[in-house]
Amino acid sequence: KSPESLEGSKAVAYIAVADMSSAQWDIWSINDAAMEGTEDAFRTPSEVYSEASWPIVANAGFFYSSGGKNYSSSLAVRNSEILAYNINYASEDWVTMYYPTRAAFLETETGAFDACWTYRTWDNHYMYPSPAENTWDAKPADQPSATYPEGGEEFAARTAIGGGPVLINDGKFTDSYVEELFNGASGIGPDSAQPRTAIGVTVDKKIVL
């Protein structure tokens, strides 16, 4: 647990470290792969913990309810099955449409870990080493594809969780909340003090929550 003050502000923060040479990382999510909403009930961290007594359970991703259905706005992959995708459009006025790439933290089939940005079209699901250059202050960037942003490849993961923004990538400060369109109309308030959860991995394969 953190001290009562961090960088001059009051804080209640916790950190947990898992050595992935012996630990297991898993997720739970509603199944909304069709992005049409589901009657699957959301679960609290306490409910997930009670089923398996995990040493550490943390909330993750973005989600909401509407019209009697539950929706996920963030990628979720478990045992190589995609349960939900990151959102693939956003707008401030529902006239001008943007197509943001959103963050993902994933484990590959070989046990390697990575942070990336993802986008799902109707026919394909891509992952990128950098985000699409979107900002609410400019016209929408091109819709992501196999060739934009550069370095795109077909998405593949054994386990993954979306949300965002990416804060650190390859050891460098990134914080792509502008490109991921988390400011402004999103209501996320990335530059304000709010409860947050973060996940990352060290070079020696220790997951940090």
Where are these regions (language model features)?
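Generic recognition of flexible, low-complexity loop/linker segments
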Residues: 45-46, 153-156, 184-188, 196-198
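Zymogen propeptides
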Residues: 1-117
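C-terminal structured interaction module
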Residues: 194, 203-204
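Active-site-adjacent helix-turn-beta-strand microarchitecture at beta-sheet edges
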Residues: 66-178, 183-184
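Short glycine-rich loop/turn motifs
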Residues: 10-15, 102, 162-164, 193-198
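Electropositive phosphate-/nucleotide-binding environments in soluble metabolic enzymes
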Residues: 39-42, 161, 189, 193
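C-terminal soluble interaction/assembly domains
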Residues: 207-209
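Short beta-strand micro-motifs enriched in acidic
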Residues: 108, 200-202
